[in-house]
Amino acid sequence: MNPMIFIILLGTIMLGTSIVMTSSHWFLTWLGFEMNMMAVIPVLMKKYSPRSMEAATKYFLTQATASMILMLAIIINLMFSGQWTITNMDNFTASMLLTTALVMKLGLAPFHFWVPEVTQGVSLNSGLILLTWQKIAPLSLLYQIYPSINTNLLLIMSLLSIMIGGWGGLNQTQLRKIMAYSSIAHMGWMMAIMIYNPNLSLLNLFIYILMTSSMFMLLIFASTTSMLSLSLTWNKTPIITIMSLMVLLSLGGLPPLTGFMPKWMIIQELTKNNSVILPTLMAILALLNLFFYMRLTYSSALTMFPTMNNTKLTWQYQNTNILPMMMPLITMSTLALPLTPLFILLN
């Protein structure tokens, strides 16, 4: 792809997300989603292959369906309220349709099936955009309309997402699919707290983007997409392998790493709101995620003895300079837990 065209597409993606975040008019919000979707599809197909074409087609069909449901919700709301203001969503049917459209765009259960397939079919750079930046626009709209969202529906979807994000990753060895199921589980945690404390949901989003970006940067730097190839990086870059495994454990929420912070704060906030069963179930289901992350870390670091015979490796490692943001991102992704009291105070 021409670098100039790629820059224009990235600018359009950011512009579409910015329109959704700053708009108070329903039509402009829908327009921002459409701009974002049409610009990200060529980015997904940047490295042309049948697999990337299939992934882009699945993404287009899912997002187009969600946009259609979103427009239907907007029209129904307009019929009953006569206003285009975003915060005015009093109709039950419109609220349910809007919630369905947004969780479909986010990839929450039971509309999660496209996330692992699309992520596995695209390059690491495209997967980074798909699992980080593309979550901002739907979550920003949910943040604006959270008082009118059906609480029970959102909590059921969040629990399903945490459960499926854990179960789905148990038998995976492909890192992109592991990151996709991790995304589904993290979205479930964000939705669970959205009703009670939307600011905490935004903090969770920030930490999730931080950890996911760190992991993808490490994978891009090491040119690896599977656990086997990641474990073989011991021969070339042992520091990269160690940092990758640390970020994986942080994504699983293992204390004392950064990933434990949002889970700690969310469980504390739910308990303050006299909710005991929900955080208990969420904590139990989160053990599924932690289990497969620890199993992957164990198999990669302790059971595969490093070999010095580099001729056995199908190595695509490129001697490029470490990205300038990589080390600060990794540090924040693993060692930011002591900042938790500060975030609790600000919250």
Curated annotation (Swiss-Prot):
Keywords: Electron transport, Membrane, Mitochondrion, Mitochondrion inner membrane, NAD, Respiratory chain, Translocase, Transmembrane, Transmembrane helix, Transport, Ubiquinone. The chain crosses the membrane at residues 1-21, 25-45, 60-80, 96-116, 127-147, 149-169, 178-198, 202-222, 239-259, 274-294, 326-346. InterPro entries: Complex_I_Subunit_2 (IPR050175), NADH_DH_su2_C (IPR010933), NADH_UbQ_OxRdtase_chain2 (IPR003917), ND/Mrp_TM (IPR001750). Its EC number is 7.1.1.2. It is a multi-pass membrane protein. GO terms for cellular component: mitochondrial inner membrane. One of its GO terms (biological process) is mitochondrial electron transport, NADH to ubiquinone. The keyword Transmembrane helix applies. Pfam families: NADH_dehy_S2_C, Proton_antipo_M. It is found in: Mitochondrion inner membrane. Belongs to the complex I subunit 2 family. Core subunit of respiratory chain NADH dehydrogenase (Complex I) which is composed of 45 different subunits. Interacts with TMEM242. This is NADH-ubiquinone oxidoreductase chain 2. It comes from Suncus etruscus (Etruscan shrew). The lineage of its organism: Eukaryota, Metazoa, Chordata, Craniata, Vertebrata.
